[in-house]
């Protein structure tokens, strides 16, 4: 399986770039991982609908989505791994929210909670939670005590 974390827009803060790189590196110990900076929702839909490939599982992060805890996210990751999903995409959208067409194309819409976060910080939180999810699946002590 390949895990892709996609965000719209350029990264402005060097600290965010550093943390993004760190969590992508940590994730790569558990799953083939790629972080992608794209320019638009249309680019995300093109990535999702590439011809000749099995359709990926597309998870959109949105304030209106389903809220899940770390263990639930781990179960979600494990389920898709065990089902043989080849491409799992988590996407953080534009600041004005996802267009209806994009929301309709999603396999799942998840929320990181009711708090509003800057998109760059939301990316780091998502990457950390994905890393935590994989450590839960493998019994790594990272999650213990949290």
Swiss-Prot record:
Gene3D superfamilies given in the database record: 3.40.1280.10
A GO MF term: rRNA (pseudouridine-N3-)-methyltransferase activity
EC number of this enzyme: 2.1.1.177
CDD domains listed in its UniProt record: RlmH-like
The entry's keywords: Cytoplasm, Methyltransferase, rRNA processing, S-adenosyl-L-methionine, Transferase
InterPro entries reported for this sequence: Alpha/beta_knot_MTases (IPR029028), RlmH-like (IPR003742), tRNA_m1G_MTases_N (IPR029026)
Catalytic activity: pseudouridine(1915) in 23S rRNA + S-adenosyl-L-methionine = N(3)-methylpseudouridine(1915) in 23S rRNA + S-adenosyl-L-homocysteine + H(+)
Domain of life: Bacteria
List of residues binding S-adenosyl-L-methionine: 60, 93, 112-117
Location in the cell: Cytoplasm
Entry GO terms, CC: cytoplasm
Function: Specifically methylates the pseudouridine at position 1915 (m3Psi1915) in 23S rRNA.
Database matches in HAMAP family: 23SrRNA_methyltr_H
Subunit structure comment from the entry: Homodimer.
PANTHER family: METHYLTRANSFERASE, RIBOSOMAL RNA LARGE SUBUNIT METHYLTRANSFERASE H
Family of the protein in this entry: Belongs to the RNA methyltransferase RlmH family.
Protein name per the record: Ribosomal RNA large subunit methyltransferase H
Species name: Koribacter versatilis (strain Ellin345)
């Amino acid at each position: 399986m390949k895990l892709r974390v996609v965000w719209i827009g350029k990264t402005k803060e060097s600290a965010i770039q550093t943390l993004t790189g760190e969590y992508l590196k940590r994730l790569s110990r558990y799953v083939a991982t790629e972080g992608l900076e794209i320019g638009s929702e249309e680019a995300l839909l093109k990535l999702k609908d590439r011809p000749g490939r099995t359709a990926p599982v597309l998870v959109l992060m949105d304030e209106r989505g389903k809220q899940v805890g770390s263990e639930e996210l781990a179960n979600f990751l494990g389920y898709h791994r065990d089902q043989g999903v080849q491409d799992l995409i988590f996407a953080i959208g534009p600041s004005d929210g996802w267009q209806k067409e994009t929301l309709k194309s999603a396999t799942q819409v998840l929320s990181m909670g009711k708090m509003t976060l800057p998109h760059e910080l939301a990316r780091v939180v998502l990457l950390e939670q994905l890393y935590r999810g994989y450590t839960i699946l493998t019994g790594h002590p990272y999650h213990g005590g949290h």
